[in-house]
Amino acid sequence: AKWYPEVRHHCPNTPIILVGTKLDLRDDKDTIEKLKEKKLTPITYPQGLAMAKEIGAVKYLECSALTQRTVFDEAIR
């Protein structure tokens, strides 16, 4: 949501697709431990959907940062 105000200001009619990346790390033990040290947890799919709704995004997608295939497939539809 960091860029949301700027995007809405400069491109008010542009549809937004919110993308949750690094899906492959959601279940990664090292990543989970590092997040726990900061009192954080990975973002869940329902949390991503809620954020998309909050900012008025037309779609919420998740992908592995390694492939980004899901996002590309959706973008060309």
Curated annotation (Swiss-Prot):
UniProt key word Hydrolase: yes
Enzyme class: hydrolase
UniProt key word tRNA-binding: no
Processing and modification events after translation: The N-terminus is blocked. GTP-bound active form is ubiquitinated by HACE1, leading to its degradation by the proteasome.
GO terms for biological process, alphabetical: actin filament organization; cell motility; neuron migration; positive regulation of bicellular tight junction assembly; positive regulation of protein phosphorylation; regulation of cell migration; small GTPase-mediated signal transduction
EC number of the protein: 3.6.5.2
Example of a GO MF term: GTP binding
Reactions performed catalytically: GTP + H2O = GDP + phosphate + H(+)
Subcellular location(s) of the protein: Cytoplasm; Membrane; Melanosome; Cell projection, Lamellipodium
SUPFAM superfamilies: P-loop containing nucleoside triphosphate hydrolases
Control of this protein's activity: Regulated by guanine nucleotide exchange factors (GEFs) which promote the exchange of bound GDP for free GTP, GTPase activating proteins (GAPs) which increase the GTP hydrolysis activity, and GDP dissociation inhibitors which inhibit the dissociation of the nucleotide from the GTPase. GTP hydrolysis is stimulated by ARHGAP30.
Domain of life: Eukaryota
One Gene Ontology cellular component: lamellipodium
SMART domains for this protein: RHO
PANTHER family listed in its UniProt record: RHO FAMILY GTPASE
Subunit composition and interactions: Interacts with NISCH. Interacts with PIP5K1A. Interacts with the GTP-bound form of RAB7A. Interacts with SRGAP2. Interacts with CYFIP1/SRA-1. Interacts with PLXNB3. Interacts with ARHGDIA; the interaction is induced by SEMA5A, mediated through PLXNB3 and inactivates and stabilizes RAC1. Interacts (GTP-bound form preferentially) with PKN2 (via the REM repeats); the interaction stimulates autophosphorylation and phosphorylation of PKN2. Interacts with the GEF proteins PREX1, RASGRF2, FARP1, FARP2, DOCK1, DOCK2 and DOCK7, which promote the exchange between GDP and GTP, and therefore activate it.
Family from the record: Belongs to the small GTPase superfamily. Rho family.
Function as written in the Swiss-Prot or TrEMBL entry: Plasma membrane-associated small GTPase which cycles between active GTP-bound and inactive GDP-bound states. In its active state, binds to a variety of effector proteins to regulate cellular responses such as secretory processes, phagocytosis of apoptotic cells, epithelial cell polarization, neurons adhesion, migration and differentiation, and growth-factor induced formation of membrane ruffles. Rac1 p21/rho GDI heterodimer is the active component of the cytosolic factor sigma 1, which is involved in stimulation of the NADPH oxidase activity in macrophages.
Designated name of the protein: Ras-related C3 botulinum toxin substrate 1
Organism: Cavia porcellus
